[in-house]
Amino acid sequence: PRAEAMVENFVFQWLRLRELENIDPDQEIYPAYNPGLLEAFRKEIRLFAGNIFSENASILNLLTADYTYLNEDLALHYGISDIKGGHFRKVQLDDDERFGLLGTGGVLMVTSYANRTTPVIRGAYIMENFQGVPPASPPPNVEDFPETPEGATV
C-alpha cells in the first residue's frame, strides 16, 4: 500500500503522467485506442515502478529493465501474442525496442501529440525528467516546418 501511494504520488507527478487524462488520441490515426487502454497504461507503470521500489532495485532499472507488466489487451497492443487473460503479470520482453519506463505506452503517449509522435518533445522530456537539464532554446534563425497538406502521408 505505501509503495502504491509512492508510485501514484511520486512517479506520476515526476513523469507528468497525470497529464494522460487530458490526452485524447486521434481515433482516425490510432483506431485501437480506447479508455481501457489508458487505464492499462497507468496500471502497467504503477506495477512496474512499484516492483522496482518494493524490491529495492537499482533506480537505473527504471530505464533499463527488460520486463514490464501486461494483461492480454495491453500485450496485444504491444504486439505480444502469448499473454492471455485480464490480470496483469510480469512479462520478460524479448525485443530491443521496449525498455523500462521510456518504453511504456503511458510515457510514449504523454510525450506525443494527439495525432503524431514527437521525437523532439520526447527528447526534451528525457533531458528534463531524467537528466535534470532543460533543453536549450532553438537558434533564432530556425524556421517552422511547413504545414502538412490535407491527406498527405509519409
Q: Language-model segments: what does each one mean?
A:
Residues 1-154:
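Active-site substrate-binding loop specific to GH73 endo-beta-N-acetylglucosaminidase modules
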